[in-house]
A protein has these predicted regions:
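Surface-exposed loop/turn motifs in large extracellular/passenger domains
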Residues: 1-9, 16-38, 47-67, 76-149, ...
Length: 190
């Protein structure tokens, strides 16, 4: 029964997970309440700047995650790439005998790279931050998810687009960075 009310990442670190240049492996399960915010370019939960996220959320949990600028709410930080084996982010959200996870994830805002002065898009709510890393997202059982995209990114997915889910119980609601509902017709509760 963990309760983490305000995990805040330092500069380029995730709220919970990896620091600058580091991937984060995080498991949140069974009667836990977590609120996490990434530092500049770090995921709320997952990888820091240039780091991937390997995140499992399971059972009766309440998770609120917000990415730092350009980073995912849950997933990777800015500038992350697939590992040597070609694997990107791995995110699993599922129900179990203790109950249903409720997840609110918001991608970080867009910004400007201070070194290159190039525009950086926002991060996905769940998935990949600004960068080339792919996201392997698995949702199982009954889930309640609200995901909001950062500017020029997706609510749930990676640079290849919104990930489609079928055959789930519960609800998935997706919003773009302007607050427009972009929930897919295949999402439960649509």
């Amino acid at each position: 029964n963990a309760k983490i009310e305000n995990a805040q990442g330092g500069f380029t670190g995730s709220g919970i997970g990896g620091g600058n240049g580091a991937s984060g492996t995080v498991t949140i399960k069974d009667d836990s309440t977590v609120t996490a915010t990434g530092g500049e370019a770090g995921a709320g939960i997952g990888g820091g700047y240039a780091g991937l996220g390997d995140v499992t959320i399971e059972g009766n949990t309440m998770v609120n995650a917000t990415g730092g600028a350009g980073a995912a709410g849950i997933g990777s930080g800015v500038g992350s790439v697939n590992d040597a084996a070609g694997n990107g982010n791995k995110i699993t959200i599922r129900s179990n005998e203790t109950g249903t996870p409720t997840v609110n994830a918001t991608g970080g805002k867009s910004g400007i790279d201070e070194e290159t002065e190039e525009k950086i898009p926002g991060g996905a709510g769940i998935g990949s931050g600004a960068g080339d890393a792919k996201a392997n997202i698995t949702l199982e059982g009954k889930v309640t998810i609200t995901a909001t995209a950062g500017k020029d990114n997706v609510a749930i997915g990676d640079k290849n687009g919104e990930q489609v889910f079928t055959g789930l119980d519960g609800s998935i609601t997706r919003y773009d960075s302007e607050g427009n509902d972009i929930t897919l017709p295949t999402d439960p509760g649509y």
